[in-house]
Amino acid sequence: MSGGAYWPRPWSCEDGGNRRLGVPEGQVGPGIRPEEGLEVTAVKDAFATDMVIRREPGELYALRHGLPLGNPLVASVEGWVEKLDPETLEVTASTPRLPAGRFWPGGIGAHENGDIYMVFGRWAHRLSPGLEVLASHSLPVDRPHNSFVVLDGGELVTKDCDAPEARH
């Protein structure tokens, strides 16, 4: 990863890292030769899934959430993280529904300490790789927050969404 104290595997956070290149660093591509093809092995209808990250081989995590009723920047929602089997996309573990507050897509990332962090709405949650909730914290600004980045020192940095509809 270029910058940030992320888990040292490709695609362990939103957009592939702090530089937001949208590509998994450290991989040159899938290596498909002209005589080879791709095959779909699983399809999963997972409505309201914002993003998927990897940690170790075989570990795939999805950020899920409820949908707000009415104005999405005012209505309160819950979010959760699911661990998926990478071959079947079946859910192998899940957090409980976690408080989020007002809706904004948020994000998840695998930290270099091994834990999964989730920033969604006005809440930050720390999760074990098995998706036990280790800590939850309501962020100080009562507005939804837009995901996060992890700095080289391991600190998480997020920003609130200052959309006019999000203000009281």
Predicted region positions:
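A short helix->beta-strand "capping" segment at the edge of beta-propeller domains
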Residues: 18-47
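Short glycine/acidic-enriched loop and turn motifs that connect beta-strands
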Residues: 18-19, 66-72, 123-125, 162-166
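Short loop/turn segments that connect beta-strands within beta-propeller blades
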Residues: 85-88, 128-132
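A detector of repeated loop/turn-to-beta-strand junctions in beta-rich toroidal repeat architectures
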Residues: 8, 76-78
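Repeated scaffold domains used in trafficking and secretory/extracellular systems
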Residues: 45-52, 100-109, 141-153
